[in-house]
Protein backbone atom coordinates (compact mmCIF):
# COMPACT_ATOMS: atom_id res chain seq x y z
CA UNK A 1 0.00 0.00 0.00
CA UNK A 2 1.52 3.31 -1.11
CA UNK A 3 -0.08 6.38 0.45
CA UNK A 4 1.39 9.88 0.57
CA UNK A 5 0.72 13.49 -0.41
CA UNK A 6 -0.25 14.32 -3.98
CA UNK A 7 2.95 14.62 -6.03
CA UNK A 8 5.12 12.60 -3.63
CA UNK A 9 6.04 10.00 -6.25
CA UNK A 10 3.66 7.15 -5.45
CA UNK A 11 2.80 6.43 -9.08
CA UNK A 12 6.44 6.54 -10.18
CA UNK A 13 7.42 4.14 -7.41
CA UNK A 14 4.54 1.82 -8.29
CA UNK A 15 5.65 1.83 -11.93
CA UNK A 16 9.22 0.94 -10.92
CA UNK A 17 7.99 -1.91 -8.73
CA UNK A 18 5.86 -3.22 -11.57
CA UNK A 19 8.78 -3.04 -14.00
CA UNK A 20 11.20 -4.70 -11.58
CA UNK A 21 9.01 -7.44 -10.10
CA UNK A 22 5.90 -7.66 -12.27
CA UNK A 23 3.61 -6.74 -9.37
CA UNK A 24 0.24 -5.50 -10.64
CA UNK A 25 -0.68 -1.92 -9.76
CA UNK A 26 -4.11 -0.71 -8.66
CA UNK A 27 -4.47 3.06 -9.03
CA UNK A 28 -6.73 3.96 -6.15
CA UNK A 29 -7.22 7.49 -7.50
CA UNK A 30 -9.36 5.86 -10.21
CA UNK A 31 -12.00 5.36 -7.52
CA UNK A 32 -12.81 9.07 -7.30
CA UNK A 33 -16.52 9.86 -7.43
CA UNK A 34 -17.94 11.54 -10.51
CA UNK A 35 -18.03 15.33 -10.59
CA UNK A 36 -21.85 15.26 -10.80
CA UNK A 37 -22.23 13.36 -7.51
CA UNK A 38 -24.37 15.60 -5.27
CA UNK A 39 -22.64 14.27 -2.15
CA UNK A 40 -19.19 15.55 -3.12
CA UNK A 41 -17.53 17.71 -0.43
CA UNK A 42 -16.77 21.34 -1.33
CA UNK A 43 -14.38 24.03 -0.13
CA UNK A 44 -13.81 27.75 -0.57
CA UNK A 45 -10.76 28.62 -2.66
CA UNK A 46 -10.12 32.35 -3.07
CA UNK A 47 -13.80 33.19 -2.78
CA UNK A 48 -14.87 30.44 -5.18
CA UNK A 49 -16.63 27.26 -4.07
CA UNK A 50 -15.06 24.20 -5.68
CA UNK A 51 -15.22 20.45 -5.18
CA UNK A 52 -12.75 19.40 -2.50
CA UNK A 53 -10.95 16.59 -4.31
CA UNK A 54 -8.52 16.37 -1.39
CA UNK A 55 -11.27 15.29 1.01
CA UNK A 56 -11.60 11.49 1.42
CA UNK A 57 -15.34 11.96 0.91
CA UNK A 58 -14.65 12.58 -2.79
CA UNK A 59 -13.41 9.00 -3.09
CA UNK A 60 -15.26 5.66 -3.05
CA UNK A 61 -13.37 3.76 -0.35
CA UNK A 62 -15.84 0.85 -0.25
CA UNK A 63 -15.47 0.18 -3.98
CA UNK A 64 -11.67 0.29 -3.70
CA UNK A 65 -11.68 -2.25 -0.86
CA UNK A 66 -14.03 -4.57 -2.77
CA UNK A 67 -11.79 -4.47 -5.84
CA UNK A 68 -8.69 -5.34 -3.82
CA UNK A 69 -10.47 -8.14 -1.98
CA UNK A 70 -11.65 -9.59 -5.31
CA UNK A 71 -8.16 -9.33 -6.77
CA UNK A 72 -6.62 -11.21 -3.85
CA UNK A 73 -9.37 -13.84 -3.66
CA UNK A 74 -9.92 -14.50 -7.36
CA UNK A 75 -6.71 -13.26 -8.96
CA UNK A 76 -8.58 -10.74 -11.11
CA UNK A 77 -10.81 -7.69 -10.73
CA UNK A 78 -12.34 -4.89 -12.77
CA UNK A 79 -11.48 -1.30 -11.87
CA UNK A 80 -12.61 2.09 -13.18
CA UNK A 81 -10.37 4.27 -15.33
CA UNK A 82 -10.83 7.84 -14.15
CA UNK A 83 -10.33 10.97 -16.26
CA UNK A 84 -9.29 13.68 -13.80
CA UNK A 85 -9.70 16.50 -16.34
CA UNK A 86 -13.34 15.46 -16.90
CA UNK A 87 -13.97 14.44 -13.27
CA UNK A 88 -15.57 11.23 -14.50
CA UNK A 89 -14.81 7.58 -15.15
CA UNK A 90 -13.82 7.05 -18.79
CA UNK A 91 -14.19 3.27 -18.77
CA UNK A 92 -12.97 0.19 -16.94
CA UNK A 93 -9.91 -2.07 -16.97
CA UNK A 94 -9.24 -5.60 -15.79
CA UNK A 95 -6.27 -6.31 -13.53
CA UNK A 96 -4.87 -9.76 -12.77
CA UNK A 97 -2.50 -10.95 -10.03
CA UNK A 98 -0.65 -14.26 -10.35
CA UNK A 99 -0.27 -16.50 -7.28
CA UNK A 100 2.56 -15.37 -5.02
CA UNK A 101 2.51 -11.80 -6.28
CA UNK A 102 2.21 -8.68 -4.22
CA UNK A 103 -0.35 -6.14 -5.40
CA UNK A 104 0.72 -2.50 -5.30
CA UNK A 105 -2.22 -0.26 -4.40
CA UNK A 106 -1.35 3.44 -4.58
CA UNK A 107 -3.24 6.70 -4.15
CA UNK A 108 -3.60 9.81 -2.04
CA UNK A 109 -6.39 8.23 0.02
CA UNK A 110 -4.74 4.81 0.35
CA UNK A 111 -4.24 5.26 4.09
CA UNK A 112 -8.01 5.50 4.57
CA UNK A 113 -8.39 1.76 3.89
CA UNK A 114 -5.37 0.41 5.77
CA UNK A 115 -7.61 -0.78 8.60
CA UNK A 116 -10.12 -2.44 6.28
CA UNK A 117 -7.42 -4.33 4.38
CA UNK A 118 -5.74 -5.41 7.61
CA UNK A 119 -9.08 -6.66 8.94
CA UNK A 120 -9.56 -8.61 5.70
CA UNK A 121 -6.13 -10.21 6.16
CA UNK A 122 -4.72 -8.96 2.86
CA UNK A 123 -2.43 -6.09 3.93
CA UNK A 124 1.29 -6.74 3.44
CA UNK A 125 2.53 -3.28 4.47
CA UNK A 126 1.48 0.36 4.30
CA UNK A 127 3.76 3.27 3.42
CA UNK A 128 3.51 7.03 3.31
CA UNK A 129 5.82 8.04 0.45
CA UNK A 130 7.21 11.52 0.96
CA UNK A 131 9.81 14.13 0.01
CA UNK A 132 10.49 17.59 1.50
CA UNK A 133 7.15 19.33 1.02
CA UNK A 134 8.35 22.09 -1.33
CA UNK A 135 9.90 19.43 -3.56
CA UNK A 136 6.49 17.74 -3.59
CA UNK A 137 4.82 21.09 -4.38
CA UNK A 138 7.03 21.60 -7.44
CA UNK A 139 6.63 18.05 -8.73
CA UNK A 140 2.86 18.18 -8.28
CA UNK A 141 2.45 21.54 -10.03
CA UNK A 142 4.59 20.52 -13.02
CA UNK A 143 2.64 17.27 -13.37
CA UNK A 144 -0.80 18.82 -13.00
CA UNK A 145 -0.05 21.61 -15.48
CA UNK A 146 1.38 19.15 -18.00
CA UNK A 147 -1.70 16.94 -17.72
CA UNK A 148 -4.09 19.95 -17.72
CA UNK A 149 -5.91 18.51 -14.76
CA UNK A 150 -7.63 21.77 -13.85
CA UNK A 151 -7.30 25.50 -14.62
CA UNK A 152 -3.75 26.77 -13.86
CA UNK A 153 -4.86 29.23 -11.15
CA UNK A 154 -6.85 26.50 -9.42
CA UNK A 155 -3.82 24.19 -9.55
CA UNK A 156 -1.53 26.85 -8.08
CA UNK A 157 -3.90 27.76 -5.25
CA UNK A 158 -4.64 24.12 -4.52
CA UNK A 159 -0.93 23.30 -4.54
CA UNK A 160 -0.11 26.02 -2.02
CA UNK A 161 -2.98 24.92 0.22
CA UNK A 162 -1.81 21.30 0.07
CA UNK A 163 1.75 22.29 0.92
CA UNK A 164 0.62 24.21 3.98
CA UNK A 165 -1.53 21.27 5.10
CA UNK A 166 1.03 18.56 4.31
CA UNK A 167 2.44 18.05 7.85
CA UNK A 168 -1.07 17.42 9.17
CA UNK A 169 -1.92 15.13 6.23
CA UNK A 170 1.23 13.06 6.76
CA UNK A 171 0.58 12.83 10.51
CA UNK A 172 -2.93 11.53 9.81
CA UNK A 173 -1.55 8.84 7.49
CA UNK A 174 0.84 7.75 10.22
CA UNK A 175 -2.04 7.56 12.71
CA UNK A 176 -3.93 5.36 10.25
CA UNK A 177 -1.00 2.93 10.17
CA UNK A 178 1.35 4.05 7.38
CA UNK A 179 5.13 4.17 7.83
CA UNK A 180 6.77 7.27 6.31
CA UNK A 181 9.83 6.84 4.08
CA UNK A 182 11.32 8.07 0.84
CA UNK A 183 10.66 6.11 -2.37
CA UNK A 184 14.09 4.43 -2.42
CA UNK A 185 13.70 3.18 1.15
CA UNK A 186 10.19 1.88 0.49
CA UNK A 187 11.44 -0.01 -2.56
CA UNK A 188 14.33 -1.49 -0.59
CA UNK A 189 12.03 -2.64 2.22
CA UNK A 190 9.52 -4.19 -0.17
CA UNK A 191 12.28 -5.96 -2.08
CA UNK A 192 13.60 -7.57 1.10
CA UNK A 193 10.22 -8.49 2.61
CA UNK A 194 8.27 -9.63 -0.43
CA UNK A 195 6.59 -13.02 0.04
CA UNK A 196 8.07 -16.13 -1.53
CA UNK A 197 6.02 -17.90 -4.16
CA UNK A 198 6.79 -21.14 -2.33
CA UNK A 199 5.68 -20.22 1.17
CA UNK A 200 3.17 -18.06 2.94
CA UNK A 201 4.42 -15.18 5.07
CA UNK A 202 4.07 -15.49 8.82
CA UNK A 203 2.70 -11.91 8.94
CA UNK A 204 -0.95 -12.32 10.04
CA UNK A 205 -1.97 -9.46 7.72
CA UNK A 206 -0.35 -11.00 4.64
CA UNK A 207 -1.46 -13.52 2.06
CA UNK A 208 0.52 -14.62 -0.97
CA UNK A 209 -1.51 -12.14 -2.99
CA UNK A 210 -1.28 -9.28 -0.53
CA UNK A 211 -1.66 -5.56 -1.08
CA UNK A 212 1.69 -3.88 -0.70
Over which residues does each language-model region extend?
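Conserved beta-strand scaffold positions in the cores of enzyme catalytic domains, especially
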Residues: 23-27, 126-128, 180-181
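Conserved lysine of the Walker
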Residues: 10
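Hydrophobic positions on the alpha1 helix immediately C-terminal to the Walker A/P-loop
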Residues: 13, 17
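Hydrophobic anchor at the beta1->P-loop junction of P-loop NTPases
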Residues: 2
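The conserved Walker
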Residues: 6
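NTP-dependent small-molecule kinase module
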Residues: 98-99, 142, 161-212
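ATP-dependent NMP and nucleoside kinases share a basic, alpha-helical "lid"
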Residues: 90-149
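Conserved nucleotide-sensing/catalytic segment adjacent to the nucleotide-binding pocket
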Residues: 24-33, 38-86
